[in-house]
Amino acid sequence: MSSSLSPSSPPTSPSDADRADEHTRSGGATFSTGWPEPSCVLITARGDLDAANANDFVDWAMQHAAHAKRMVLDLSGIEFFGTAAFSALHTFNVRCAGARAEWVLVPGSAVLRLLRICDPDAMFPLCDDVDTAMAALRGESQRLLKLVAEPR
């Protein structure tokens, strides 16, 4: 892990959740963490994720994920997503499965481009935006129009 990452800790109580907002920089990317709900962490990356910082990102994410039951990984602000970043994302997925942690990925166009090539089986849980991801983790589904009435 690069020395540009500074250790930090997530909120320890629900009252701290609204105030938590942490940032760090690694290579060509900025990572931030927020706690929109006490048991859910929002981990955001902006810029470039590549061989220089992909493992730093996973370490940053897992450090905060250790204190959450649910995670949203917001990569919608990623401008370049290299194959090392895909490999790191796979590592994140495996580590979350081992920890029985739920997570959802919000990809941007650069991330989607590589996922179409490297993840044809769509193994990562994807949502279009952070709000939809949060709703999915809470178990809320999008309301669908019912075309047939159910018997009472």
PLM regions and their residue ranges:
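STAS-like cytosolic regulatory interaction modules
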Residues: 1-77, 91-152
